[in-house]
Design a protein with these regions (language model features):
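Bacterial Sec-dependent N-terminal signal peptides
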Residues: 1-10
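Hydrophobic core
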Residues: 11, 15-19
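Pocket-lining segment of extracytoplasmic ligand-binding domains
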Residues: 167-169, 244, 250-338
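Bacterial lipoprotein signal-peptidase II cleavage site
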Residues: 22-31
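Short, glycine-/small- and polar/acidic-enriched structural segments
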Residues: 33, 70-245, 261-267, 278-285, ...
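Long, intrinsically disordered low-complexity tandem-repeat segments
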Residues: 40-66
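Conserved small/polar residues in nucleotide/adenosyl-binding loops
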Residues: 382-384
């Protein structure tokens, strides 16, 4: 489903909710004099403001309590938590085109041309794995990998047909005219907010008034993920903290020098540092309140999907089948990624982390997550 549609739905829901919260319903009939009516209106307004303040205070307290709970112990943060309806089993799906599908594919402009998939590593390597396992070929397609500086740009310009990437990276571009669309879920998790293990920062509440690194830049995925994590705890990412880009490799030193208090890092990068007692996680996309949302997603060039609907379904099926295989065969998948240079050499660490991501998300889970993410993003802007 196109994110624009989801965003419009989320916006409508948010607007309706705001109207419902602020509306006073049908006014009661009255014969009171204008002055009396004005007094009554003023009293009602004051009562509403008081109620709003009380509600805000309750929400803030609840957010602080939740933050304290989710930040207290993350010794098992990478353990798999099964959620009904989250995964989709594509492992036994035969991608071979039926006679009817093949005839339809032959009529599409992309027929006979190689599918260009974005070559990426780690948790976004599903399109690569689909090629390595022969799933594009099974679907009646040929494929070739492409590289560059930005999968968002590659999808938007038509330099690539399909990629897996962070929703947080593509959310805003997809609503600002970039020619891409979301077509399926990839996995949950993969990034968290870290502080020095011996620091005074225990929860996100403790980070108020400090500088936090969002390594890949203002407005990019790290910035957006950090904003959502903070906003979920009642912390305004624009007013209560300062978000600043510090390169991932320099973040620990910057923390030690007091230049930043925390950093949004990939769990793969931070894992060994946590094990060695250098870093500690205070908030994560793997926390219970974010496990109901996808982190990375399958995206395609929107015009390509419109002009080649049958071929597009086959492409998505190939990537989804790869994700299912990665979830069901974590050891083999991890070794494949290591052999292809798509994962670091630490086998045990990568098996654990890859397991926690729960590759292969169902359509229902993904759509519900997209709605929640879009709404959260809109609300975070409203709170500014």
């Amino acid at each position: 489903m196109r994110l624009r549609k989801l965003m419009c739905t989320a916006m409508s829901a948010a607007i309706v909710a705001s109207m419902a919260g602020c509306g006073q319903g049908k006014p009661a009939e009255t014969t009171a004099a204008p002055a009396a009516a004005e007094t009554t209106k003023a009293e009602e307004t004051k009562a509403e403001e008081t109620k709003a303040e009380e509600t805000k205070a309750e929400e803030t307290k609840a957010a602080e309590t939740k933050a304290a709970e989710v930040s207290s112990d993350r010794s098992n943060m990478f353990d798999v938590i099964e959620t009904e309806g989250r995964a989709i089993d594509y492992g036994n799906v035969d991608l071979t085109p039926t006679a009817e599908e093949l005839e339809a594919m032959k009529k599409e402009p992309a027929y006979g041309k190689p599918v260009r998939y974005w070559m990426s590593d780690g948790c976004t390597s599903g399109p690569n794995v689909a090629n390595l396992l022969g799933y594009y070929e099974e679907a009646g397609l040929t494929a070739e990998g492409v590289k560059g500086t930005s999968y968002t740009e590659a999808l938007g310009t038509g330099a690539a047909e399909v990629a897996v990437g962070h929703i947080a990276t593509m959310l805003v571009p997809s609503t600002n005219g970039v020619d891409l669309t979301f077509v399926g879920g990839a996995h949950i998790g993969c990034k968290s907010l870290y502080v020095l293990a011996d620091s005074e920062y225990k929860t996100t509440e403790d980070l108020k008034g400090t500088r936090i690194s969002t390594p890949n830049g203002i407005g990019a995925s790290d910035y957006n993920i950090t904003s959502l994590l903070l906003d979920a705890d009642g912390i305004n990412p624009q007013k209560d903290v300062e978000l600043t880009p510090v390169e991932t490799s320099a973040c620990v030193t910057a923390m030690e020098n007091g230049e930043i208090s925390a950093a949004l890092l990939s769990d793969t990068f931070a894992y060994k540092l946590v094990q060695d007692g250098k870093l500690r996680c205070v908030r994560s996309l793997l926390d219970a309140d974010f496990q109901g949302e996808p982190c990375c997603i399958i995206a395609m060039n929107a015009t390509f999907v419109k002009e080649n609907p049958v071929i597009s379904r086959k492409i998505v099926g190939a990537v989804q089948k790869a994700h299912s295989w990665m979830r069901e065969n974590p050891d083999e998948a991890t070794q494949m990624l290591i052999d292809e240079g798509l994962n670091s050499e630490d086998f045990d660490m990568n098996v654990k982390l890859n397991n926690s991501l729960q590759f292969g998300l169902s359509t229902d889970f993904t759509e519900a997550g997209l709605r929640a993410i879009a709404e959260d993003y809109i609300l975070s802007l409203i709170h500014i």
